[in-house]
A protein has these predicted regions:
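Non-heme di-metal
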Residues: 2-411
């Protein structure tokens, strides 16, 4: 593998000014893909979060490329998609294989929910569109609750505490209770942004969170049935159904009028943005090197996607995206922000494409039907309290901001 053509500066960066590594030089051999995983005991939790995020981003890039190829009649385009997609698959293999085999499925699950909490928290804080911001805040309180439910399962099954995984960076306590997250599917579809007027950052945010939630959904779909314990199987099933709602929620925020070529450019630009972001914020020098290498690959993918769009649509893709990458996506604590949302938005649900505070007939009908038996997300807390005399929580900033959700003495 040749060295990247010029190291990337950590100042304002224009991805259109860099060619990166030529596509014909990007395929790696097995030895280059066989990377040592991170240390499960000593790695920065946010390093693991960045790995999980980029795995989801690469998985989305791969599946988008496959879907594009299935509807594209142009042979040259399909061949180039295949060429780039093969490299994306190698990138996904390297990134996902950085996760340590010693980590249990539940430990990785806790990290997935830490991603869902702190990545969505950052995006929500940075989102310029008020409606889209509200959509991110809505989903954030739901994934925050999933972290709490899985943390209680983790201590019950593995007799270890989630603070070992989240390292005090993310609190563990109830969010919007998961049993209240089951809505009529009609109420999971949001209004899309307008491709002509939306801020470019809004487009990148939507792609990022959609891909992350999609990866979480797929992970739970595949990992849930591998457990023997009934409560674990049930919990993954219930939360997995909420992830279906979340993918619907986030994917519907993308403008369906974007052309396939436009979407391809957006995907490649977003990959450049995220690899660049994580290269700047990564604490592990070895992992930072992988982010830089993949950035230099993605710069070439972006160039090729732009060339395809110019040829197919006679449009300049650089006119629809910023010349300089936005402020880097950063994994950081969101404790104060989440507590503010808990105090003000805990009872929200959705009606049509809007977010409302009052329950309504369609919501209540869905609740009555799906929660006819006590849901696993409540049972897991019951069983933890019965076994340990208390819930598992990690409340580093004081009591829960919602009085009714504060832990009550076990009787």
């Amino acid at each position: 593998m040749p060295s990247p053509q010029g190291r990337v500066s950590l100042v304002a960066f224009n991805p259109f000014d860099h060619r990166g590594i030529p596509i014909d030089d990007q395929i790696r051999n097995w030895g280059q893909l066989d990377v040592a995983p991170i240390d499960p005991d000593n790695a920065d939790p946010y390093t693991k979060c960045r790995i999980i995020t980029m795995n989801g981003i690469e998985a989305e890039a791969i599946m988008f490329s496959h879907h594009f190829a299935r509807v594209c009649p142009d042979l040259d385009t399909r061949q180039l998609l295949a060429k780039v997609r093969y490299v994306e698959q190698q990138q996904q293999k390297l990134v996902n294989w950085l996760l340590p085999g010693q980590a249990s499925v539940l430990e990785t699950t806790l990290s997935y929910e830490q991603v869902a909490t702190d990545l969505t928290g950052w995006v929500a804080r940075m989102e310029p569109d008020p409606y889209l911001k509200a959509c991110y805040e809505f989903g954030l309180l739901e994934d925050f609750d999933h972290l709490y439910r899985y943390a209680n399962l983790y201590e019950m099954i593995e007799h270890r505490k989630a603070e070992k995984i989240v390292d005090g960076l993310t609190e563990v306590m109830p969010g919007r209770p998961t049993y209240q997250q089951h809505r009529d599917p009609l109420d999971n579809v949001r209004q899309p942004y307008d491709r002509e007027t939306a801020a470019p950052l809004s487009k990148l945010h939507a792609l990022t969170i959609m891909a992350a939630e999609q990866q979480t959904m797929n992970f739970y779909m595949n990992m849930g049935p591998l457990y023997m314990e009934p409560i674990a199987r049930q919990l993954y099933q219930e939360i997995g159904m909420v992830e279906e709602e979340h993918v619907t929620h986030y994917e519907s925020m993308l403008d369906p009028h974007e052309t396939w070529y436009e979407r391809l450019v957006n995907h490649e630009y977003n990959e450049c943005y995220l690899y660049y972001s994580f290269m700047q914020t990564e604490s592990d020098p070895r992992i930072k090197g992988f982010w830089e290498l993949h950035l230099n690959m993605e710069l070439e993918h972006l160039r090729l996607a732009c060339d395809l769009m110019r040829r197919a649509e006679d449009r300049d893709p650089e006119a629809m995206l910023p010349r300089e990458l936005p402020e880097p996506v950063t994994f950081e604590q969101n404790k104060t922000y989440i507590r503010q949302l808990l105090a003000t938005q805990i009872d929200y649900t959705t009606l049509g494409t809007g977010i409302v505070q009052e329950a309504h007939e369609r919501f209540e009908a869905m609740q009555d039907r799906i929660n006819a038996e006590r849901p696993s997300t409540e049972i897991v807390i019951d069983e933890h309290r019965h076994k340990f005399g208390e819930e598992y929580r990690l409340e580093t900033e004081g009591p829960h901001p919602v009085p009714r959700l504060r832990e009550k003495p076990y009787q």
